[in-house]
A protein has these predicted regions:
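Negatively charged
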Residues: 1-204
Length: 204
């Protein structure tokens, strides 16, 4: 690592442990990370807090990560406050059960493409985008939330958010949706048909 830049390279494969939680957490001076083709995440099951508090990180491309066996992505990027560019286009999230706090306080993230995400196994989404105060629009129309038990504070204080598509969201009677839109004062374009979630929007 030099001047806050980290390049991961090796002659052979680098395979982290199945539990890769907190792998690079608190690398507060890290500005960029480049993962070479040698970084093999095929056997990883837990990415909880993997980049937690990488507070100086500005861009991150994880499009080559194999996440097909990952079940926990909670807090994966929380407190990455300087992050402006994040590429997760190759992510397979089909068996992920927890996305809670995943982008918590990513305050400078302006764009986020999660169109390839499969949320059908997810049970926890609370605080997922909490404090993403620079996001202006977000399309989560592909999300199937039929198994989600907790959505509390999901978009809390997304204060620049004007457009949000959650047309695929469904909240059961027992799903926690408290304060899901609290602080979303600029949100005027909401695509949603679920009555329980719409009530939270009305009362935000």
């Amino acid at each position: 690592m030099d001047n806050g830049d980290l390049y991961v390279a090796a002659d052979g494969a680098i395979a982290p442990n199945p539990n890769a939680s907190w792998l690079l957490h608190n690398f507060v001076n890290l500005k960029t990370i480049k993962f070479g083709n040698c970084f093999d995440t095929a056997n990883v099951t837990d990415m909880h807090g993997m980049f937690h508090n990488c507070a100086s990180l500005t861009s991150l491309d994880l499009s080559d990560f194999d996440t097909s066996n990952v079940t926990d992505m909670s807090g994966m990027f929380n407190y990455c406050a300087s992050l402006t560019s994040l590429d997760l286009s190759g992510f397979d999230t089909s068996i992920v059960t927890s996305m809670r706090y995943m982008f918590f306080r990513c305050a400078n993230l302006t764009n986020l493409n999660l169109s390839g995400f499969d949320a059908s196994a997810v049970t926890e989404m609370d605080c997922m985008f909490y404090g993403c105060s620079s996001l202006t629009s977000l399309n989560l129309s592909s999300f199937n939330t039929s198994n989600v038990e907790n959505m509390q504070w999901m978009f809390y204080n997304c204060s620049s958010l004007t457009s949000l598509d959650i047309s695929g969201f469904r909240a059961s009677k027992g799903t926690k949706t408290d304060l899901i839109f609290s602080g979303c004062n600029k949100l005027t374009d909401l695509q949603c048909s679920d009555s329980k979630i719409l009530l939270e929007y009305k009362n935000r």
